[in-house]
From Swiss-Prot:
Cofactor: binding comment: Binds 1 [2Fe-2S] cluster per subunit. This cluster acts as a Lewis acid cofactor.
UniProt organism field: Pseudomonas aeruginosa (strain ATCC 15692 / DSM 22644 / CIP 104116 / JCM 14847 / LMG 12228 / 1C / PRS 101 / PAO1)
Sequence similarity: Belongs to the IlvD/Edd family.
Cofactor requirements of the protein: [2Fe-2S] cluster; Mg(2+)
InterPro entries, sorted: Dihydro-acid_dehy_C, DihydroxyA_deHydtase, DiOHA_6PGluconate_deHydtase_CS, ILV_EDD_C, ILV_EDD_N, IlvD/EDD_N
Domain of life of the organism encoding this protein: Bacteria
Glycoprotein keyword on record: no
Lineage of source species: Bacteria, Pseudomonadati, Pseudomonadota, Gammaproteobacteria, Pseudomonadales
Residue numbers carrying N6-carboxylysine: 124
Protein name (Swiss-Prot/TrEMBL): Dihydroxy-acid dehydratase
HAMAP family the UniProt entry points to: IlvD
């Protein structure tokens, strides 16, 4: 049986100095026989998804210590993509994922912790911690801060979210009073933004990967029920330590739980619920850390057979995460996928022997457990707050309508093919991705004229300045991981296209990425990126581009000979923007760009460069 990792610094005469320091943190003689469990918290007052996490690390710590462990909390950074968006701050968002992963590794390995409880929530924090957990491969439990309640206003018949505020602000026909009302109403509580954006998508995927408890992705941040997830996570971390270190059961290690089948399950869920395209980027990165051979071709294969069973904002205005929870949360979607023969149910989870066992216990259409039904009735209170667990509102009934409800059965799917697709062609030889859940069927096949912008800033200026017309395909390039650097999100350009009435009349292609709040014919992650010699860097104004989602293709309608001539010319000039950009690129960002790979590899570091 493996020794506690922490014995490195807690046992032996020569560790007297280290033990003296441990004692200074409050440890006693008896504590040196217990597992040391790191709590990676991500509390910050900058981010609504994390503003309520301040005391939750110690909540978990107390539960760990009651269960027989020693808890030690530390913090990571957390960037708010919504606040960082639309200016140079967005250059730091994706690179922060690597910083978070590294910081968790640094703290856990420097202090020889035996296990981790990861308290995450928003866009890059859950992926960063997931990468670290799979890199370290010690017992781990994820528990996130939970989703925000949807906003309410008398000016709209549907729930509001961040994207609604952005769209009305850019719509010249909306009064200042309406914009102000949406601004004040869109984000009413603490928690990750209320739709199926990147943060909520990733927190849902941790359930499918088997690394978090049921309800982690859908239980509202404000609801009292969420406290139980934190308490159970603390107890579970100690239990996993006992099974691994005490009994030699390595099935509890994250790489043995999040194996190839589990990654397929996570991607299957993502496709079925129309999650953010960013999840593709993060799952590819996590798979590399887990040494799982899961790549873009696997995602392409799954996208062709998995139907869309759930539609949530921004793909539809009617439903938000609180509605997903009322419909039974993630395990109800997993249950429908399992009944459709689309899920691996023999994989283990941190809380159940198998996914099949977990579905039987937690799918509201299978279980008769009244406690489970009560749990999924947890609903919004509609009271603005920044306090976790501050309300106990219940829906009067569950949404178990699998024909016309929020979550559908395979037989009543929103669409036969899922909400995400991978496209290939001469403009993206290594692939690009589109959230089909947010694309109107009338433009699933679209041919248009390229309108070139060498940066997001230039595109925003062009769209707001009416340079983009119906039938155009907006090309935003040199915004990839290396070229940005940092692979900015393009939520502003897509929102402004909507506000200009062009949401169903234009397309957008970029080597950058999109916010989970994006909808419309928005194609990102074009690989190779322009800065790496990708063909997106060869497109010229007026070129025709054909997008064909049903056939999973995207092609620049230019001859191979012409492309070869353009490539030879570009090689001479160097792969950089044709127009200068007023962009501050710090040493930290330059270091990131030096090692960054294109999006088809998850935008992770190029290990070949590091290994020499």
């Amino acid at each position: 049986m493996p020794d506690y990792r922490s014995k490195t610094s807690t046992h032996g005469r020569n560790m007297a100095g280290a033990r003296a320091l441990w004692r200074a943190t409050g440890m006693k003689d008896e504590d040196f026989k217990k597992p040391i469990i790191a709590i990676a918290n991500s509390f910050t007052q900058f981010v609504p998804g994390h503003v309520h996490l301040k005391d939750l690390g110690q909540l978990v710590a107390r539960e760990i210590e009651k269960a027989g462990g020693v808890a030690k909390e530390f913090n990571t950074i957390a960037v708010d993509d919504g606040i960082a968006m639309g200016h140079d701050g967005m250059l730091y968002s994706l690179p922060s994922r690597e910083i978070i992963a590294d910081s968790v590794e640094y703290m856990v390995n420097a202090h020889c912790a035996d296990a981790i409880v990861c308290i995450s929530n928003c866009d890059k924090i859950t992926p960063g911690m997931l990468m670290a957990a799979l890199r370290l491969n010690i017992p781990v439990v994820f528990v996130s801060g939970g989703p925000m309640e949807a906003g309410k206003t008398k000016l709209a018949s549907h729930g509001l979210d961040l994207v609604d505020a952005m769209v009305v602000a850019a719509d010249d026909s909306c009064s200042d009073e309406k914009v102000a009302e949406y601004e004040r109403s869109a984000c009413p509580t603490c928690g990750s933004c209320s739709g199926m954006f990147t943060a909520n998508s990733m927190n849902c995927l941790t359930e499918a990967l088997g690394l978090s408890l049921p309800g982690n992705g859908s239980t509202l941040a404000t609801h009292a029920d969420r406290e139980q997830l934190f308490l159970r996570a603390g107890r579970l971390a100690v239990e996993l330590c006992q099974r691994y270190y005490g009994e030699g059961d390595d099935s509890v290690l994250p790489r043995n739980i999040a194996n190839f089948k589990a990654f397929e399950n996570a991607m299957t869920l993502d496709i079925a619920m129309g999650g953010s395209t960013n999840t593709i980027l993060h799952l590819l990165a996590a798979a590399q850390e887990a040494e799982v051979p899961f790549d873009l071709r696997d995602i392409d294969r799954l996208s062709r057979k998995v139907p869309q069973l759930c539609k949530v904002a921004p793909n539809i205005q009617k439903y938000h995460m609180e509605d997903v929870h009322r419909a039974g949360g993630i395990f109800s979607i997993l249950g429908e996928l399992a009944r459709g023969g689309l899920l691996h149910t023999d994989v283990p989870t941190v809380h159940s022997p198998s996914m099949a066992d977990a579905i039987a216990q937690w799918d509201i259409t299978q279980t008769r457990d009244e406690a489970v039904h009560t749990f999924f009735k947890a609903g919004p209170a509609g009271i603005p707050t920044q306090t976790a667990f501050s309300q106990n509102t219940r829906w009067p009934s569950l949404d178990d309508d699998r024909a016309e409800g929020c979550i559908r059965s395979v037989e009543h799917a929103y669409s036969k093919e899922g909400g995400l697709a991978v496209l290939y062609g001469n403009i993206a030889l290594d692939g690009c991705v589109v959230k089909t859940a947010g694309v109107d069927e009338s433009i699933h096949v679209f041919e248009g004229s390229a309108k070139i912008f060498e940066s997001q800033d230039a595109a925003v200026k062009g769209i707001l300045g009416d340079e983009v017309k119906a039938g155009d395909i907006v090309i935003i390039r040199y915004e990839g991981p290396k070229g940005g650097p940092g692979m900015q999100e393009m939520l502003y350009p897509t929102s402004y296209l909507k506000s200009k009435g062009l949401g169903k009349q234009c397309a957008l292609l970029t080597d950058g990425r999109f916010s989970g709040g994006t909808s419309g014919l928005s194609i990102g992650h074009a690989s190779p990126e322009a800065a790496a010699g990708g063909a997106i860097g060869l497109v010229q104004d007026g070129d025709k581009v054909l997008i064909d989602i049903p056939n999973r293709s995207i092609n620049l309608l230019v001859s191979d000979e012409e492309l070869a001539a353009r490539r030879a010319e570009q090689d001479k000039k160097g792969w950089k923007p044709a127009a200068p950009r007023a962009r501050r690129v710090s040493t930290a960002l330059k270091a990131y760009a030096l090692l960054a790979t294109s999006a088809d590899k998850g935008a992770v570091r190029n290990k070949a460069l590091l290994d020499g």
